[in-house]
């Protein structure tokens, strides 16, 4: 379906400009003035700002307790994000119980979020159960489109805690494949 948004004040990295926007499906295909009205739907945005969707780069749809127990908010609540103009969330994905990080990411995207989220969902890996296979998973996560991982130096004496040797080994593996590491 083609949608034409006409006469709005478009705000982007170039600043503000009066312009029309043509959307085909989920993709912006043209921004300009006096675009032809060859669309299934025309929206008059005169007197209004047209902004890109927001990105929430720090979402927690799984709450982690220091005992390693995970509590969940479900992705069907993301309609609230959409109502506020946020079109993408980047959720932290801890190890699901009994799963490695790669399987946890697949589960999160293909089971928990699939068909539930009202916005686009991306993930930060959240290593909450370091094992012998964790280092080998880091490049696989990058290949899957997961650009970052969160590690914990806080919460010593809990399952979340990562000692210096594990932390450094994760950081070295991340450097080799271009993954960003975050430390809490």
Per-region residue spans from a language model:
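Glycine/Thr-rich phosphate-binding loops of Rossmann-like dinucleotide-binding domains
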Residues: 18, 31-32, 65, 99, ...
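Histidine-rich, glycine-flanked metal-binding segment
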Residues: 1-4, 9-52
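Metal-associated gating/positioning segment near the N- to mid-region
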Residues: 45-116
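Histidine/acidic-residue-rich, glycine-tolerant segments that coordinate divalent metal ions
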Residues: 96-107, 111-184
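Residues that line or immediately flank small-molecule/substrate-binding pockets and catalytic motifs
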Residues: 12, 93, 153
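Divalent metal-coordination and catalytic microenvironments
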Residues: 8, 21, 26, 47, ...
């Amino acid at each position: 379906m083609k949608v034409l948004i006409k006469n709005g004040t478009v705000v982007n990295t170039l600043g503000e400009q009066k312009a029309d926007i043509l959307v085909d499906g989920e993709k912006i295909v043209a921004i300009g003035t006096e675009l032809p009205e060859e669309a299934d739907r025309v929206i008059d945005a005169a007197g209004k700002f047209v902004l890109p969707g927001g990105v929430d780069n720090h979402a927690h749809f799984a709450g982690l307790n220091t005992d390693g127990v995970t509590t969940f908010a479900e992705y069907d609540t993301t309609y609230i994000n959409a109502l506020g103009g946020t079109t993408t969330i980047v959720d932290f994905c801890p190890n699901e119980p009994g799963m490695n990080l790669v399987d946890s990411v697949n589960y999160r995207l293909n089971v928990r979020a699939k068909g539930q989220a009202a916005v686009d969902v991306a993930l930060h890996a959240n290593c909450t159960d370091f094992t012998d296979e964790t280092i080998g998973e880091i490049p696989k996560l990058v290949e899957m489109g997961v650009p970052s991982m969160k590690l914990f130096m806080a919460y010593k004496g809990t399952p979340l805690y990562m000692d210096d040797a594990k932390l450094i080994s994760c950081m070295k593996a991340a450097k080799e494949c271009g993954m960003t590491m975050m430390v809490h």
